[in-house]
Amino acid sequence: MIKGAVFDMDGLMFDTERLVYENWQSMMDEYGYPYDIEFFKQTVGKRKKEVHLMYLSRFGDDFPYWQYADEGKARYVEHIKREGIPVKKGLYDILEYFKGSGVKIALATSTSRQTSELNLKIAKVSDYFDALVCGEDVKNGKPHPEVFLTAAERLGLDPRDCAAFEDSINGIKSAYAAGMTTVMVPDFLQPTDEIKPMITHLCRDLNEAIDQIRNS
């Protein structure tokens, strides 16, 4: 049995990638920039500094990325405070399962601590987590393993005794490089041929992930 469970957040715990995409699509339509979901998919799992460069490359050096990112975040916060946060199937079950089994739980996300803590609070899952590792806590974003190695360290565990739960390609690369058991629950992105050998368990949802971990 694993001793630690390390969760990505957006797209894995919460159906927030779609909210972010819808905000960007709405803003880009309003401001007259051609935009589509395929470009957005390329940004999934990357840190904002990387995404910033992608937008400049696509839309020009004068593209006001940070202005739009701030506006998008404000729209996002307003939405989840008003409507709540969309929780992925099986999230409460898997957190309860690990907590009841004595497994330590950490968050490993490229999202800011402020937004991460707000998401956890609104979903009422903050108390399940023994450690949070957020975007500003590491120098290197996924696919570098730093975020997962830091999560294991904060849990006081060897990474090899932990399972990482991810929905993104970069996330799986990061967790695999950290030496963790990897569990992929795809959201926007399906596993590529490159990362399939890196995936220990490929699951439809977090309920199936419980079964896979329990039976492994």
Predicted regions and their residues:
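Asp-based, Mg2+/Mn2+-dependent phosphohydrolase catalytic module
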Residues: 1-3, 96-99, 112-216
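Active-site neighborhood of HAD-like aspartate-dependent phosphohydrolases
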Residues: 1-42
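Conserved SAM-binding loop
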Residues: 13, 87, 105-108, 140, ...
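Short beta->alpha linker loops
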Residues: 19, 46-47, 86-90, 111, ...
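Helix-loop "lid/cap" segments that line or gate small-molecule binding pockets
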Residues: 27-28, 47-61, 119, 151-152
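Short, surface-exposed acidic
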Residues: 33-41, 60-69, 159
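Residue-level detector of anion-binding/catalytic polar loops
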Residues: 34, 104, 181
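Metal-dependent phosphoesterase signature
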Residues: 55-93, 101-103
